[in-house]
């Protein structure tokens, strides 16, 4: 229609008329056009069902998703995608702000602001000229008064003085405050450059080969991969003008070190790469931190490890730059690119607080800041009873011994900020507290010499300090998961409160779901049951494909082949079928030979051609999936599961016992776990393969493979148990499926919590160590994802 007819008050009439026409309601459309005086000009609306229909569909999906997310998974995914885009855009804006601040500092080197924007990701604003920054500025000015000649025949005392200057400038501003210290470090370095008359051109952008869209979307993590921002390097005496120690487009400059003729030792130029996403401190805490550093600096002035007495030979263990024989320029890279913590070549940064009395006051400040951060950061915490996010119900600590049944109270939802020591959330090894707070983790390229480390004593005490610093509570043991530790072999993300929440609900089955299984990379989830076909879910897009109903009866178990998209299904029709998830339209082969319904299957973790199955007649068969049955034994009628990683042992459930078979020793039965008073429904292995959990209606038992004893037991309190699996991130936590509810059992403290799960029996549980999620399948025809 003509442009003049597109007034705001006419738009709705135009859309309604277009909708009626495309719905072929021509008489109604004609009447509406006449009465509403709608323009007869053609409407340029590119929507097959009419713009009104398109608009209403999107509106309704979003509306119903916000009121009841179970009604529209597509809308919920749309909202989640929009939130992700918003976070991504925010990260780009923050990166832009930091780059702009760096440019402003380079344009105005005559007015450095040592108390400048030391803000977290540039969002906290200026913190002002505090007492700490004034003290730091004064000490910096005193050091700048020292002579620093430019000739190449510099004497050894002058070299020592330059190294002291390097260390003081590095450590005065080497705070653990999150963010890139644009004001402090950049201005200080530019002041050095102006006094030595060595303008250094630094590229603002340090590109690590990834686009801004690949930056982390959660800036609140304590140790996320941060945005690396370039800092002007220190122009050491003897370096040619314009030389930068920064990497070129993110790639480290090659080569090792250079020695200027006449110098008593190597000259080291560091590129200051800060991790944006380190410990978060408020502006007031930043001031306390800075003041503590200045005081600690004053106490350590006479230390042989600090200041002008620094032996230049201590730099020999550091990564070296490249010697250019043409102009003698040095390109040094400290190997800290991509490192999760700030690296430093200063030796004193590795001093543990337990050995240095001068940093006791700062440790006190750090402990206070840690407590303040925990109070701000964590959700509902519990030093005694555990709180839930959904209701006011609480669970108190259990006084029962680990070998006795524990009692528990249902709680709707879990978000416990207990004393969760995440074992490897901070790397262990030569990482220690220094007088500047948290020291850097020396990489393999710049580890300190072993003899320098000997004086620091046992590192074990330090690791305790790190864990207590990262803990979310006082560690009094009163919280539900007070001593729960994260699986160090899989998860290295930051310490955060434990939570177990439903993140997705999948409803595609028309009948009961009996089994589910993750692929080894966690990207696919297969579920099956009374539908006699397998539903295969893409965990990234939640798109689903299904196999045809090739089985004649219900499917009892489904398992993925290790490191493959192939999977196997067992059925009441006495057969096993092999499928490929990448092309599920038809099965690859059928394995026959059982004389009774096949109840369970499992692939060997290493010998991926080997498949084990059991039937209701207590027969266990081992198959070569490309050939036939290779051997058979008696001993399982419910479930079979190989020991993870090695596959040396097989756990087999039959009636009320669990048998352990040694696969590498002619399938010899090496142990029988007895103790259940009713039939065992499910078994699972701990991640390290040293424990076996078995579940029956009345109890869950945890068995030691080495001793054969039941070391922990949980009796039900009215909720009949049916399935069990170890939590993928916390190896001491068992996830138990019962009737409608999921039990979370901390085996170390023998405490339990109940989470509302499904509307019927939770028939199976699966977990993915790769993604840290748990899947639950139920007779209510749904599969839920938990994390």
UniProtKB/Swiss-Prot annotation:
PROSITE patterns (UniProt xref): LISH (PS50896), WD_REPEATS_1 (PS00678), WD_REPEATS_2 (PS50082), WD_REPEATS_REGION (PS50294)
Predominant cellular place of this UniProt entry's protein: nucleus
Low complexity biased stretches: 336-346, 355-372
Spans of repeat WD: 508-547, 550-589, 593-633, 635-671, 675-715, 717-755, 757-787
Compartment annotation: Nucleus
Residue stretches of biased makeup (Polar residues): 380-409
Transmembrane segments: none
Induction comment from the UniProt entry of this chain: Induced by exposures to biotic stress (e.g. nematode and Botrytis cinerea) and abiotic stress (e.g. salt, genotoxic, wounding, drought and oxidative stress). Repressed by exposures to biotic stress (e.g. Agrobacterium tumefaciens) and abiotic stress (e.g. hypoxia, cycloheximide, 2,4-dichlorophenoxyacetic acid, AgNO(3) and aminoethoxyvinylglycine).
LisH domain location: 8-40
An annotated GO cellular component: nucleus
Disruption phenotype: Strong defects in seed mucilage extrusion; no mucilage capsule formation and slightly irregular columellae in seeds. Altered structure of mucilage that accumulates abnormal levels of substituted rhamnogalacturonan I and methyl-esterified homogalacturonan. Increased amount of most sugars associated with an increase in methylation of the mucilage and/or primary cell wall pectins. Reduced MUM2 expression in seed coat and embryo. Shorter roots. Enhanced tolerance to salt and osmotic stress conditions. In plants lacking both LUG and LUH, embryo lethality and abnormal flowers.
Segments for region (Disordered): 299-413
Keyword terms: Activator, Coiled coil, Developmental protein, Differentiation, Flowering, Nucleus, Repeat, Repressor, Transcription, Transcription regulation, WD repeat
Expression sites (tissue/organ): Expressed in roots, stems, leaves, seedlings, apex, flowers, siliques, flower organs and seeds (including seed coat).
A biological process term (GO) from this entry: response to silver ion
Chain intervals for the UniProt region annotation (Required for SEU-binding): 1-88
Coiled coil: 77-106
Stored Pfam families: LisH (PF08513), WD40 (PF00400)
Molecular function GO labels: transcription coactivator activity; transcription corepressor activity
Oligomeric form and interacting partners: Forms corepressor complexes with SLK1 and SLK2; LUH is the transcription repressor subunit and SLK1 and SLK2 the specific DNA-binding adapters. Interacts with SEU. Binds to YAB3, YAB5 and YAB1/FIL; these complexes promote adaxial cell identity in leaves as well as embryonic shoot apical meristem (SAM) initiation and postembryonic SAM maintenance.
Stated role: Transcription repressor subunit of the SEU-SLK1 and SEU-SLK2 transcriptional corepressor of abiotic stress (e.g. salt and osmotic stress) response genes, by means of an epigenetic process involving histone modification (e.g. H3K9 and H3K14 acetylation), probably by recruiting HDAC, to facilitate the condensation of chromatin thus preventing transcription at the target genes. Can also act as a transcription activator. Implicated in embryo and floral development.
Record protein name field: Transcriptional corepressor LEUNIG_HOMOLOG
Species in which this protein is naturally found: Arabidopsis thaliana (Mouse-ear cress)
């Amino acid at each position: 229609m003509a442009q003049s007819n597109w007034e705001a008050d006419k738009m709705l009439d135009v859309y309604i008329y277009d909708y009626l026409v495309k719905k072929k309601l021509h008489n109604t459309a004609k009447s509406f056009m006449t009465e509403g005086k709608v323009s007869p000009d053609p409407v340029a609306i590119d929507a097959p069902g009419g713009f009104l229909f398109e608009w209403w569909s999107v509106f309704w999906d979003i509306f119903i998703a916000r009121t009841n997310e179970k009604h529209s998974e597509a809308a919920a995914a749309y909202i989640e995608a929009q939130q992700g885009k918003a976070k991504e855009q925010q990260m780009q804006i923050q990166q832009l702000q930091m780059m702009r601040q760096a440019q402003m500092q380079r344009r105005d080197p005559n007015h450095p602001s040592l108390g400048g924007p030391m803000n977290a990701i540039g969002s906290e604003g200026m913190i002002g000229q505090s007492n700490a920054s004034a003290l730091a500025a004064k000490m910096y000015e005193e050091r700048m008064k020292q002579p620093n000649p430019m000739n190449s025949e510099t004497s050894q005392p002058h070299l020592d003085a330059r190294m002291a200057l390097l260390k003081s400038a590095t450590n005065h501003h080497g705070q653990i405050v999150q963010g890139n210290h644009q004001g402090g470090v950049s201005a200080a370095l530019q002041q050095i450059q102006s006094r030595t008359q060595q303008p250094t051109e630094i590229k603002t952008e340090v590109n690590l080969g990834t686009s801004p869209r690949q930056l982390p979307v959660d800036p609140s993590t304590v140790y996320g991969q941060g945005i690396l921002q370039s800092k002007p390097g220190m122009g050491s005496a003897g370096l040619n003008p314009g030389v930068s120690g920064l990497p070129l487009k993110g790639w480290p400059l090659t080569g090792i070190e250079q020695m200027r003729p006449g110098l008593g030792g190597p000259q080291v130029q560091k590129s200051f790469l800060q991790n944006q996403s380190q410990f978060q401190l408020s502006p007031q805490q930043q001031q306390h931190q800075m003041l503590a550093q200045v005081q600690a600096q004053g106490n350590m002035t006479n230390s042989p490890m600090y200041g002008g007495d620094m032996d230049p030979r201590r730099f020999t263990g550091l990564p070296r730059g490249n010697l250019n024989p043409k102009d003698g320029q040095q390109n040094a890279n400290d190997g800290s690119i991509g490192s999760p913590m700030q690296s430093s070549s200063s030796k004193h940064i590795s001093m543990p607080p337990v050995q240095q009395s001068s940093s006791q006051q700062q440790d006190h400040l750090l402990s206070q800041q840690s407590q303040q951060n925990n109070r701000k950061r964590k959700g509902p915490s519990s030093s005694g009873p555990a709180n839930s996010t959904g209701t006011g119900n609480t669970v108190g600590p259990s006084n029962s011994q680990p070998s006795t049944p524990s009692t528990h109270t249902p709680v709707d939802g879990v978000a416990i900020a207990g004393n969760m020591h995440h074992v490897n959330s901070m790397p262990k090894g030569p990482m220690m507290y220094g007088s500047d707070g948290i020291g850097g983790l020396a990489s393999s390229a710049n580890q300190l010499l072993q003899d320098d480390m000997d004086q620091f004593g046992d590192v074990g005490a330090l690791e305790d300090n790190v864990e207590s610093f990262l803990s979310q509570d006082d560690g009094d043991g009163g919280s539900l998961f007070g001593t729960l530790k994260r699986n160090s072999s899989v998860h290295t993300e930051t310490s955060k409160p434990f939570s177990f929440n439903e993140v997705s609900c999948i409803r595609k089955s028309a009948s009961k779901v009996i089994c589910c299984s993750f692929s080894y990379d966690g990207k696919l989830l297969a579920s099956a049951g009374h539908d006699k076909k397998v539903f295969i879910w893409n965990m990234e897009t939640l798109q689903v494909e299904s196999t045809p109903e090739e089985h004649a009866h219900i499917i009892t178990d489904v398992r993925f082949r290790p490191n493959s998209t192939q999977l196997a299904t067992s059925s009441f029709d006495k057969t096993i079928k092999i499928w490929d998830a990448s092309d599920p339209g038809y099965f690859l082969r059928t394995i026959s030979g059982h004389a009774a319904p096949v109840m369970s299957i499992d692939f060997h973790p290493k010998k991926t051609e080997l498949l084990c199955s059991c039937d209701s007649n207590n027969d266990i068969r081992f198959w070569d999936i490309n050939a036939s049955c290779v051997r058979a034994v008696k001993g399982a009628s419910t479930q079979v599961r190989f020991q993870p990683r090695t596959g040396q042992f097989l756990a087999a459930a039959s009636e009320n016992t669990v048998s352990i078979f040694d696969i590498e020793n002619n399938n010899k039965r090496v142990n029988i776990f007895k103790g259940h008073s009713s039939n065992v429904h499910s078994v699972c292995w701990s991640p390290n393969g040293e424990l076996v959990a078995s579940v029956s209606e009345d109890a869950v038992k945890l068995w030691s493979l080495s001793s054969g004893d039941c070391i922990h037991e949980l009796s039900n309190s009215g909720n009949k148990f049916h399935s069990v699996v170890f939590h993928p991130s916390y190896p001491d936590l068992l996830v138990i499926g019962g009737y409608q509810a999921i039990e979370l059992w901390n085996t170390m403290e023998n405490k339990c919590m109940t989470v509302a799960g499904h509307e019927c029996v939770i028939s199976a549980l699966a977990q993915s160590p790769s993604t840290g999620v748990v899947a639950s399948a139920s007779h209510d025809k749904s599969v839920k994802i938990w994390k």
